[in-house]
């Protein structure tokens, strides 16, 4: 089963189109990370949070990414990083049209 990584942290913006323009180079580098299948970017201007949900090919790749990304976020001044690693239940996810390969 592929692991799913959820990361979120306090974020004061920008949001929407402005964050798209600001973070596009980062997105283009993230897709090159070893073992990453996909990432869904998350943001909430109302609660001042951002993050993402990531699907990896294996737990080692997910753990390596979490460690690297936590260092990157911390170096950028981000505090309050929350992360959870889950196993994906493929059969049930497929029934519910989960984007599982």
Where is each model-derived feature located?
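A common structural junction motif
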Residues: 70-78
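Short S/T/G/P-rich N-terminal loop/turn motif that feeds into the first structured element of a domain
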Residues: 1-49, 60-67, 84-101
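A short, exposed loop/beta-hairpin motif centered on an aromatic-Gly-Thr core
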Residues: 51-55
């Amino acid at each position: 089963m592929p692991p799913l990584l959820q990361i979120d942290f306090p974020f004061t913006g920008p949001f929407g189109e402005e964050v798209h323009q600001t973070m596009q180079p980062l997105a283009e580098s993230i897709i090159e990370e070893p073992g990453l299948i996909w990432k869904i970017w998350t943001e909430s201007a109302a609660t001042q949070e951002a993050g993402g949900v990531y699907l990896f090919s294996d737990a080692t790749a997910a753990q390596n990414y979490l460690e690297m990304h936590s260092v990157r976020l911390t170096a950028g001044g981000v505090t309050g990083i929350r992360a959870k690693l889950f196993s994906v239940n493929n059969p049930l996810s497929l029934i519910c049209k989960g984007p599982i390969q």
